[in-house]
């Protein structure tokens, strides 16, 4: 009896929190408009530079190191991961067809047809997938490697 009531309360909470998340523009109200800013570190140029340097680093590192060393294997995992994430994000864009913030003020515009490919972010997926193999491989030995996780966070903020 006690267990059934506990499960019922969990279900009720899930329904209430789901409704609140939907009403608030996504989970925890995170899907809302923010001020557009292209100055300083938020400029589009910096984001493109980050993506280009990430590509050059993982591709160059993989070719330079080869696949025999620990570092070389990690570079090749990053290349594989980045390619897979790019393909998956592109497929997701065509499946979801979400409008960009510049196209609408409503964050719930999904399945809008051709030209609406805001989500998922291919650039954030690329950066995330490129650093993840390094975090997994070296994070426990060198905790500073976890700081690489700031790159996708930065990239996702700049994308807005």
Annotated model-derived regions:
Residues 15:
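…; additionally, a secondary subgroup of soluble metalloenzymes is captured
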Residues 2-12, 45-46:
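Bacterial N-terminal signal peptides that target proteins for export
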Residues 22-120, 124-159:
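Hydrophobic alpha-helical bundle signature of multipass membrane enzymes
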Residues 18-20:
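N-terminal signal peptide c-region/cleavage motif recognized by signal peptidases
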